[in-house]
Structure formats: structure tokens, C-alpha cells
Amino acid sequence: MDERFTTWLRDFLSRHRAVAGSVHLVDGDHLAIAAAHNLPPQVIELTRAIPLGKGMAGLAWQHDKPIQTCNLKEDTSGAVKPGAKAVDGKAAVALPVKDASGTIRAIVGLAWMDERELPADEIAAIDQDARSLPEA
């Protein structure tokens, strides 16, 4: 884990009142974990390297759009993998962060304690703030 990303993530989660989250950087053909906050060790281990299209982060990367769930533990869409259900949270979103050229450089994930659908304006605000993610 990279302390720059860990510090940024803690502050980012606090600004959006989220209880857990992660930063995954694009590393060739997979996403590599760079920071995690309040994720169980088994979730960190399972998400060290995420292939394109797998789980919420992999889908956000593949489709270049935020992927959300109202409830991590009860999601049946297939986007939430079994390991992620161990996260102590309900509503969650994974969203792409792009570099200046528009290429996805990272996926940021956030989870909240309450069950809800995130409105478009809240996702837009989170997306705007995620652009402050430090460069690798």
C-alpha cells in the first residue's frame, strides 16, 4: 500500500461520509490495489489484482462508468463478488478516475453504512472530487 494514496483515501471517504473504500491503479491488464480503508484482510487479499470486467471495480474500468449497488451484502446482480460482501457497508460505488488525456488511471471505491441508491448529482460530486487522486 502507498501511504500517499492511503492518506488521500481516508480524507476522501471522510468528505463523502463513507465508511470504507479502496484505490486500485491500472497496471497493464489488471487493477492493482494501492490503498484500502476499513476493508477486511481477506477482501484486500482477494482484490490485490482485479482483471478487467470482474467485480464492481473491474466493471467500472471495463464500461468507463460508475458501478453502484444499494446493498453489498444482498446484491444479486453479479457485480458484487462474494469476497466484497465481507465489507462492513451497504451502499457502494466504484468509479473510474481519468488522467488529463481521458485514459482511466484508477478506480476508486466507496461504501456507506446505509442502504440506498446514490443519486446522479451525488455520484457527479464524488467523481469530481476523485480527480484529486494523486498521480502514481
Task: Locate the predicted segments by residue.
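Short amphipathic alpha-helical segments
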Residues: 1-14, 20, 123, 130
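A short, aliphatic-rich beta-strand micro-motif
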Residues: 90-99
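Short hydrophobic/aromatic beta-strand element in the GNAT-like acyltransferase core
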Residues: 20, 94, 107
